[in-house]
């Protein structure tokens, strides 16, 4: 018979194991509840990383109801249209639209797969040619197709204040105003006589530039505008494009004008929210030959021409070996202002193309019921700022060159009484980008070597600058201008967006003199020359206290009403007039002889100078 104490060891060894199993089960249940609560109640933006991409992008844990909420709350944007406006002497009348529909995507599925493969290939950043030829798509969107990507863009919790022209959408109104402003050279006194009708100040929705994920999505739209598709010649000529301008007629004299994906012009990629209440236009930037910070494309020649027009002091006249892009250069550091302004306003230039691009979009989406925002990178960012100021649209630019000089040359309308700090234009840049900072100039600069005269540094409205030189120890390099670098290595590397401050006082091309055809005198007073001092005056008023100037004589005669006063005044006038030179302007004196240190020792007239020289 077993003793009672003999069973105690068996009981004591089993009881702790049972407790351990119960503890593990309780912990597992608690962790499950915590995980469910985290998924259920944590905001969607934290789970989604800032933009919705479907189940493949980390949102498979969300239920179908939450996914539907994200797609219908108006913050999810998809590519719906691509607009093309031709430029150049032959193509500037071309206006086309490509609708990115489900049927179109299915018909071009093979090309889309090839495009996805291109942007996932690795690039050796030590080889500049490989970097230049690379497809510049952000690593944050690796594996996502630019044509089907969905982006999250949030509105700011506080609306922006705007004051816009009432007739801005009336056909030909803005064109006639800009033409008149050009004819009067932006004279405020004359422009104010027009008495333009402005809307009262009111609030409009604006993008939340303080939200990092919204800034990333806007930068992605700017990057999306660089997409090259389709790329083969056969595809370029397919009739998927809709002509939104004059009817397209084949031109036998210009066979390079094809109906389809045009090689020459300006593109705008239009993203639309799921509720169709907000539209974002991404304007394509520079495709630069030899400019590493941009992307390779067919529009290189026109991009370069418009860059040099918008961001140089005078038609890209940097040195005597440069070929200017217009005929406005006169002589050293002297330029024809009227000529410059007319060149910028030409129909085949990018500013007019951007206006037409916006007008074509506004035909599809009524601006009175739809919020239209514009964005772009580099040249596209500057154009977004210009069209935003023209029509009063919120604009977000990335790494754009200084566009203040172009704004003044175009004489864009300025809303009266609206403080500058309320302007809805934001320029995002970094201190290691030489183009944004305005230092990509000089003989040894990369821009100069590639043939770009990027001489402007002043921006309008707000500047939001990432100080990567101080914070990360970066050096100024043209590679830091790439939109791929901006998204992956700068915006996503910071937890917050930089503060947006107003542009401090700034002036471009301060050492240039700009002339006008109707100038009666020099724009600036001539500097004194010690080798050519002024000749002494022929009237010595100090020795003749009774003499009066002609103006004084007229004023005295007007005050004198008595006959005696009139006769006495007339008796003095002849003596005064006899002391004045007969024709002082016809035969001015000049220096005839100088001392060895430059002082004039003898004055005389031109005839006397000829006599002295002949002797």
Swiss-Prot record:
Cytoplasmic side: 1-22
Amino acid composition bias (Pro residues), ranges on this chain: 525-536
Gene3D superfamilies recorded: alpha/beta hydrolase (3.40.50.1820)
Residues with glycosylation annotation: 253, 276, 360, 551
Entry EC number(s): 3.1.1.3
Sequence ranges of Polar residues compositional bias: 538-559
Subunit structure: Binds to both phosphatidylinositol (PI) and phosphatidylinositol 3,5-bisphosphate (PIP2).
This protein's name: Putative lipase ATG15
Organism expressing this protein natively: Debaryomyces hansenii (strain ATCC 36239 / CBS 767 / BCRC 21394 / JCM 1990 / NBRC 0083 / IGC 2968)
Gene: ATG15
